[in-house]
């Protein structure tokens, strides 16, 4: 009797698939970054809409903004404070990563706009500012990272269609996702990334080790990787970051190995006497 086991088919309900909390970026078949880490569990979510209503033009009886007690300094919110209903609503938001606008990437490497619209060093904070300018509900998630852009943390979740109001457009000028991406690209082009973009004026909280006397610097590119030269301050690639500081430190000079002080062996003298 053969010991080979026959394959077993398992039925999976559509509801199970719809309820899975996954991001397509984690399963990108074109992944070319061999050291891209697994995305961590969410720890901090920053709301960019603390002053106006979170869901403009959407009936208030259908969507309720997050509770005020969940917010803290700089508009930071703890995602664990959201209700299950609010989490389901946030799942309807469109996810946007900075690498979608990176001029140094091909479409296979993550770029989603045409090359003439792409920019250098795109950041999630600037994308969030663009969405706010358009009057769209937006969340900036500082800890989320695209696996092909692991050194540039941050992503944006934006709602441009009122999915809870029969898909009504929040901004009539934004008919499709492609139009939304193109408008964001124009904003990024008009607001290029500089070192000030990651400085104290950016509004992004600094890690404790960078609270005092930290000056942002451009990072050198690593051969073979598509990466920003200006990254958020909480990136592992930031110069002087405790986790990666040794990568950029110059190697110490090794002293030349001295020759051992061994006395010379005298040469044997041979005297030849001719007869």
From Swiss-Prot:
<keyword id="KW-0733">Signal recognition particle</keyword>
<protein>
    <recommendedName>
        <fullName>Signal recognition particle SEC65 subunit</fullName>
    </recommendedName>
</protein>
<dbReference type="Pfam" id="PF01922">
    <property type="entry name" value="SRP19"/>
</dbReference>
<keyword id="KW-0963">Cytoplasm</keyword>
<keyword id="KW-0694">RNA-binding</keyword>
<feature type="region of interest" description="Disordered">
    <location>
        <begin position="28"/>
        <end position="76"/>
    </location>
</feature>
<feature type="compositionally biased region" description="Basic residues">
    <location>
        <begin position="265"/>
        <end position="275"/>
    </location>
</feature>
<comment type="subunit">
    <text>Fungal signal recognition particle consists of a 7S RNA molecule (scR1) and at least six protein subunits: SRP72, SRP68, SRP54, SEC65, SRP21 and SRP14.</text>
</comment>
<keyword id="KW-0687">Ribonucleoprotein</keyword>
<dbReference type="GO" id="GO:0006617">
    <property type="term" value="P:SRP-dependent cotranslational protein targeting to membrane, signal sequence recognition"/>
</dbReference>
<dbReference type="GO" id="GO:0008312">
    <property type="term" value="F:7S RNA binding"/>
</dbReference>
<comment type="similarity">
    <text>Belongs to the SRP19 family.</text>
</comment>
<comment type="function">
    <text>Signal-recognition-particle assembly has a crucial role in targeting secretory proteins to the rough endoplasmic reticulum membrane. It must be involved intimately in the translocation of a wide variety of protein substrates.</text>
</comment>
<dbReference type="GO" id="GO:0005786">
    <property type="term" value="C:signal recognition particle, endoplasmic reticulum targeting"/>
</dbReference>
<dbReference type="InterPro" id="IPR036521">
    <property type="entry name" value="SRP19-like_sf"/>
</dbReference>
<feature type="region of interest" description="Disordered">
    <location>
        <begin position="249"/>
        <end position="275"/>
    </location>
</feature>
<feature type="compositionally biased region" description="Polar residues">
    <location>
        <begin position="58"/>
        <end position="74"/>
    </location>
</feature>
<dbReference type="InterPro" id="IPR002778">
    <property type="entry name" value="Signal_recog_particle_SRP19"/>
</dbReference>
């Amino acid at each position: 009797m053969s010991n080979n086991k026959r394959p077993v088919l398992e039925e999976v309900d559509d509801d199970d698939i719809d309820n899975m909390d996954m991001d397509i970026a984690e399963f990108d078949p074109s992944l070319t970054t061999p050291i891209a880490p697994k995305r961590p569990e969410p720890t901090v979510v920053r709301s960019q809409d603390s002053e106006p209503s979170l869901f403009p033009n959407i009936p208030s009886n259908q969507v309720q903004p997050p509770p005020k007690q969940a917010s803290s300094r700089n508009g930071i919110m703890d995602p664990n404070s959201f209700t299950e209903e609010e989490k389901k609503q946030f799942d309807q938001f469109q996810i946007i990563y900075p690498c979608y606008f990176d001029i140094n990437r091909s479409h296979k490497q993550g770029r989603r706009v045409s090359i003439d619209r792409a920019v250098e060093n795109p950041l999630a904070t600037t994308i969030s500012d663009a969405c706010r300018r358009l009057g769209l509900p937006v969340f900036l998630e500082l800890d989320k990272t695209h696996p092909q852009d692991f050194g540039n943390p941050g992503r944006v979740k934006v709602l441009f269609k009122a999915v809870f109001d029969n898909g009504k457009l929040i901004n009539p000028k934004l008919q499709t996702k492609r139009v939304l991406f193109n408008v964001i690209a124009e904003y990024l082009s008009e607001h290029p990334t500089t070192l000030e973009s990651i400085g104290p004026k950016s509004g992004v909280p600094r890690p404790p080790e960078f609270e005092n006397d930290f000056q942002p610097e451009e990072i050198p590119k690593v051969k073979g990787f598509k990466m920003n030269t200006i990254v958020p301050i909480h990136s592992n690639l930031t110069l002087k970051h405790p986790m990666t500081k040794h990568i950029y430190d110059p190697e110490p000079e090794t002293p030349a190995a001295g020759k051992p002080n061994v006395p010379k062996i005298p040469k044997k003298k041979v005297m030849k006497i001719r007869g």
